[in-house]
């Protein structure tokens, strides 16, 4: 085996020395990315403009929010100037796609979790952003806009996984984010893991509540607070 390896090494050395690997042609080539791929963290949320599917928004765990107007061929970061780079949810107001809501703080309670700073809103397709409150929720997993009344927005805040956290649950605004009301709260150990709206009845909501706690050395999932909740009157 050793003899074979030595022979192959000698052969490759002689072969490479015999070749004329000119790098002159590289002078005419523009700089380019040959890998590895740039990382923006885990993708946590995607939304698409229904009337123009080429416009896509992608939220990431630690790399902010990205926008494509070319159906995904090219991407631009549009959230870099904000206080947090962790996005848990992005929602487009389909009746006016220039209005974008972003819930910050990744909703997946990993040990490498990044915290957020509430919910943000853009009225110009992501060119500028305004903080709309809920800064203490830490981690938002879902934002839902009522298609029949875009001033009504729901937020599922899973909250911090590291301990008791009262700023979690389901929140609702009926005035475009000027004020918020907590409409579902179980206990300080239980956050809103997800929220869905009936597409035929915006007053019907289903919320998945999850009791959990993460520590550096273990993860506790489940408890008395966990369960599925339904509302037929908008919370």
Which stretches of residues belong to each language-model region?
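Bacterial Sec-dependent N-terminal signal peptides
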Residues: 1-21
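Beta-propeller blade termini and top-face loops
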Residues: 19-235
């Amino acid at each position: 085996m050793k003899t074979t390896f030595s022979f192959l090494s000698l052969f490759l050395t002689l072969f490479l020395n015999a070749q004329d690997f000119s790098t002159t042609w590289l002078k005419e080539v523009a700089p380019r990315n040959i890998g590895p791929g740039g990382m923006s963290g885990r993708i946590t949320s995607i939304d698409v403009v229904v009337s123009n599917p080429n416009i896509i928004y992608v939220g990431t765990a630690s790399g902010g929010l990205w926008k494509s107007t070319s159906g995904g061929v090219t991407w631009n970061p549009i959230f870099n100037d904000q206080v947090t780079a962790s996005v848990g949810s992005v929602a487009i107001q389909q009746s006016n796609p220039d209005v974008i809501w972003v819930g910050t703080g990744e909703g997946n309670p990993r040990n490498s979790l990044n915290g957020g700073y509430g919910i943000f809103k853009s009225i110009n397709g992501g060119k500028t952003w305004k903080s709309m409150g809920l800064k203490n929720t830490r981690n938002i997993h879902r934002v839902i806009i009522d298609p029949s009344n875009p001033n009504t927005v729901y937020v599922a805040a899973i909250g911090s996984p590291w301990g008791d956290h009262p700023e979690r649950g389901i929140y609702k605004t009926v005035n475009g984010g000027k004020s918020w009301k907590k409409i579902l709260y179980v206990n300080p150990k239980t956050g809103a893991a997800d929220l869905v709206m009936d597409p035929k009845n915006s007053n019907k909501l289903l919320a998945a509540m999850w009791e959990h706690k993460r520590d550096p050395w273990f993860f506790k999932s489940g408890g008395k607070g966990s369960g599925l909740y339904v509302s037929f009157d908008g919370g």
